[in-house]
Amino acid sequence: MKYFVLLHKITTKMLRFISFGSGSSGNCYYLYTEEEGLIIDIGVGIRTLKKQFRDYGLSLSSVHYVLITHDHADHIKSVGSISHECQLPVYATPNVHDGIDRNYCITRKLSPSMKRFLEPGKAVQLGAFNITPFSVPHDATENVGYQIKAEGVTFCIITDAGSITDEMRSYISEADYLVIEANHDVEMLRQGPYPQHLKERIESHTGHLCNRDCAVAIAENM
């Protein structure tokens, strides 16, 4: 099931965000300043990503960092390929890196020399970006969202999420810009063609966020 990226705002004068893919076919996002940028998840093909950069008049040489939220294939398919070709460090928690190593769907294994490790709740400074990963419930090896501060604003991204925790609410409330999952209408899901076990997975607290819960999280915390 495809989810939709909900944008509170899209750009500022100095900080810009582009969604290159959102859904089960591949997820990839780009956040950048005038000097440098970072990619969040690389679940699209590398040729597709290169074309999208060209279409926006951008160059992959402006990318300095890669952040990964979790180890499902639609978020990591090309992480090893892009890291190798562009010599990009890949930042993720140790558990997510372990999951990437075990995932047979990625097009190229990630080089150990390109791995960088993050800890949920602990901020790191990467160039212009102050980045704090935080835990998000989802049925991956581990899953995080990111609070990213740059150019005087606070950006928050939550991709796959089964439910909203108090910690997530705190990060949402601090955000000037929010990207968050809105995956499905509950009744449409229940009456739809998916097998029962998949419906139950999607609706579970480690599955995917329904449209109503997404709307409530925004209304109550922003």
Question: Residue locations for each model-derived region?
Answer:
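Active-site neighborhood of phospho(di)ester-bond hydrolases with catalytic His/Asp-centered motifs
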Residues: 40-43, 63-71, 91-94, 156-160, ...
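Active-site metal-binding motif and surrounding structural segment of the metallo-beta-lactamase
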Residues: 47-92
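Cap/insert and terminal regions of metallo-dependent hydrolase folds
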Residues: 167-222
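Conserved beta-strand hairpin/beta-sheet module of binuclear metal-dependent hydrolase folds
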Residues: 3-56, 144-160, 177
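A short helix->loop->beta-strand "cap" motif at the edges of active sites that frequently abuts
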Residues: 36, 86-89, 222
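Active-site glycine- and acidic-residue-rich loops that bind
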Residues: 158-169
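Metallo-beta-lactamase
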Residues: 94-144, 149-152
